[in-house]
From Swiss-Prot:
Catalyzes the thiamine diphosphate-dependent decarboxylation of 2-oxoglutarate and the subsequent addition of the resulting succinic semialdehyde-thiamine pyrophosphate anion to isochorismate to yield 2-succinyl-5-enolpyruvyl-6-hydroxy-3-cyclohexene-1-carboxylate (SEPHCHC). SUPFAM superfamilies: Thiamin diphosphate-binding fold (THDP-binding). Pfam families: TPP_enzyme_N. Its EC number is 2.2.1.9. It catalyses: isochorismate + 2-oxoglutarate + H(+) = 5-enolpyruvoyl-6-hydroxy-2-succinyl-cyclohex-3-ene-1-carboxylate + CO2. HAMAP family: MenD. GO terms for molecular function: 2-succinyl-5-enolpyruvyl-6-hydroxy-3-cyclohexene-1-carboxylic-acid synthase activity; magnesium ion binding; manganese ion binding; thiamine pyrophosphate binding. Disulfide bonds: none annotated. Its cofactor is Mg(2+); Mn(2+); thiamine diphosphate. This is 2-succinyl-5-enolpyruvyl-6-hydroxy-3-cyclohexene-1-carboxylate synthase. One of its GO terms (biological process) is menaquinone biosynthetic process. Homodimer.
């Protein structure tokens, strides 16, 4: 067995022992040893391999798989710009704490700076965005003694375990991306004399990892008196806190569902005396204003070592609350009434509005979801719209790229999440805007030999541009002569034609037909396009606020 083949087989075997179940592979020459080893493992049923031609979409496919599987996922690519194209996914994985492993094949390091083809200083390219930069080191030339090879087997497996531990946060309680750079020398393909059954040097008995690391316990109790009028703000990455479940809770869609829900717009009707912040809230301006109020104490509870504090207003941080006191019943009733009033205001104005908007599409999707479903949301208006229409259920798993909240890679994220969710038999519905869809439309490219979602519906709310800017300062009517072009960015893309190019079923429907369409029995991946209007969004939201 040549050195690069041995090295790749050891790495793949040890990744599987560390909990990797899915790997996304992008084709290339330098990563050929990894490609052969991954294909052999896929054929043996030890992992599931997904081949993609675009490293950028491959990274987000891996994020969707990792988030839904709650397990580390690898992306393997060749050297050069293939590595650089992982940049957006690595940044998202960093801030969303997703265990993404970048398996970057490299030329032998002595070729750096020599002008060798497809070579740059890629080890460490991601800088502070990764939990660790780990190099496997170059395998020795062919002909190394069996004794040396045995020692290298342990070194390679130990390094691979370090990669998995860093990605999963087993010792830090801070999962995230890791770069595992593997320089590979020629030959890059298995020897002609290879046995029919691929062989790898032995690991530990019974499939155990070479170096076992139990998950770290990260526990920081924080005393909180619940006697003051308290609200909970639960954002992305929030943990589950049963002793806070009775408190009025503004829960963003990706947070655990609230047992005592409080609509984000209801904050305009009440005056909390303190806030318990869970995770990292990013969606609603009334929430941001409350968290920035210096007269309102904020207690931050997170599941890892970092905590958000945009306004610098948090008084204390921890991982769980040790509570004393109890909220006044009058306060709980006031919040419940404010929640009902806010939900009614939104739904009432939706019914009265003469045009279909993205908010109408979100309401139709929310009402059509079933227990056991998975919902993937675009990071712009869709995730906000779902929150505004009053969606909150513990029976639906909600995903969205909230790490740095970019729209890039959302189609690929949805496909990855669907492929993972289908292992439990559930279906996935993705709600995204047209810009988000077009931006990552290449994510629809799935080769005929690759795993394909069997229960994925992508709902595209198509208002021909960036509807979110209608609701921001840029959407002020005084900028109407320029805002449509430079912020709205109309594109006139034919969504149906785009889907046909990728052999994906699609059809255009009215919002009133969406519930029936989502209730259909369907096998495969499809796109449902709903035309929407964005010119009236500003007026619709103003009418909702006026009716609070």
């Amino acid at each position: 067995m040549n050195p690069s083949t041995a090295q790749a087989r050891v790495v793949v075997d040890e990744l599987i022992r560390g909990g990797v179940r899915d790997v996304v592979l992008c084709p290339g020459s330098r990563n050929a040893p990894l490609a052969f080893a991954l294909h052999d493992a896929d054929r043996a049923g030890r992992l599931r391999l997904h081949v993609r031609i675009d490293e950028r979409t491959a990274g987000f496919l891996a994020i969707g798989l990792a988030v839904a599987e709650r397990a580390p996922v690898c992306v393997a690519m060749t050297s050069g710009t293939a590595v650089a194209n992982l940049g957006p996914a690595v940044v998202e994985a960093n801030y969303a704490r997703v265990p993404l492993i970048v398996l970057s094949a490299n030329r032998p390091y002595e070729l750096l700076g020599t002008g060798a083809n497809q070579t740059f200083e890629q080890l460490g390219y991601f800088g502070t965005q990764v939990r660790a930069n780990i190099s496997l080191g170059l395998a020795p030339e062919s002909g190394a003694s069996a004794l040396n090879f045995s020692a290298l087997n342990g070194q390679w497996r130990s390094a691979t375990c370090r990669v998995v531990v860093a990605a999963t946060g087993a010792r830090s309680a801070n999962a995230g991306p890791v770069q595992f750079d593997i320089p590979l020398r020629e030959p890059l393909v298995p020897d002609a004399q290879e046995p029919a059954v691929p062989y790898a040097p032995d690991g530990r008995p019974d499939g155990r990892p070479w170096t076992y690391t139990p998950p770290v316990t990260f526990d920081q109790p924080l005393d909180i008196d619940l006697t003051p009028d308290t609200v909970v703000i639960a954002g992305h990455g929030a943990g589950v806190h049963p002793n806070l479940a009775h408190l009025p809770t503004v829960a963003e869609p990706t947070a655990p569902a609230a047992q005592t829900p409080l609509h984000p717009l209801a904050l305009r009707m009440i005056r909390p005396e303190q806030v318990i912040m869970l995770g990292r809230p990013t969606l609603h301006r009334p929430v941001s204003a409350l968290l920035a109020d210096p007269a309102v104490p904020v207690f931050a509870l997170t599941t890892g070592p970092r905590w958000p504090d945009v306004s610098g207003n948090s008084q204390a941080t921890g991982t769980r609350a040790v509570t004393a006191g109890a909220p006044a019943q009058a306060w709980l009733r006031r919040c419940a009434e404010a929640n009902r009033h806010a939900v009614d205001a939104v739904r009432g104005q939706l019914a009265a509005h003469p045009l279909t908007t993205g908010l109408h599409v979100a309401a139709a999707v929310a009402d059509a979801l079933r227990p056991g479903d998975q919902l993937v949301l675009g990071a712009s208006n869709p995730v906000r719209d779902i929150a505004l229409v009053g969606f909150h259920t513990a029976d639906v798993k909600v995903r969205s790229n909230r790490g740095v909240a970019g729209i890039d890679g959302t189609v690929s994220t949805a496909i990855g999440a669907a492929l993972a969710h289908e292992r439990s038999g559930g279906r996935t519905v993705a709600l995204i805007g047209d810009l988000t869809f077009v931006h990552d439309s290449s994510g629809l490219l799935i080769g005929p030999t690759e795993p394909t979602p069997r229960k994925l519906t992508i709902v595209v709310s198509n208002d021909n541009g960036g509807g979110i800017f209608e609701l921001l300062e840029q959407g002020d009517p005084r900028f109407s002569d320029v805002s449509s072009r430079i912020f709205g960015t109309p594109h006139d893309v034919d969504v149906g034609a785009l889907c046909r190019a990728y052999h994906v079923e699609s059809r255009q429907i009215e919002v009133g037909e969406l519930a029936g369409a989502l209730d259909e029995d369907f096998d495969g991946m499809r796109v449902l396009e709903v035309k929407a209007d964005r010119s009236s969004l500003r007026a619709l939201h103003a009418s909702i606020r006026a009716n609070l």
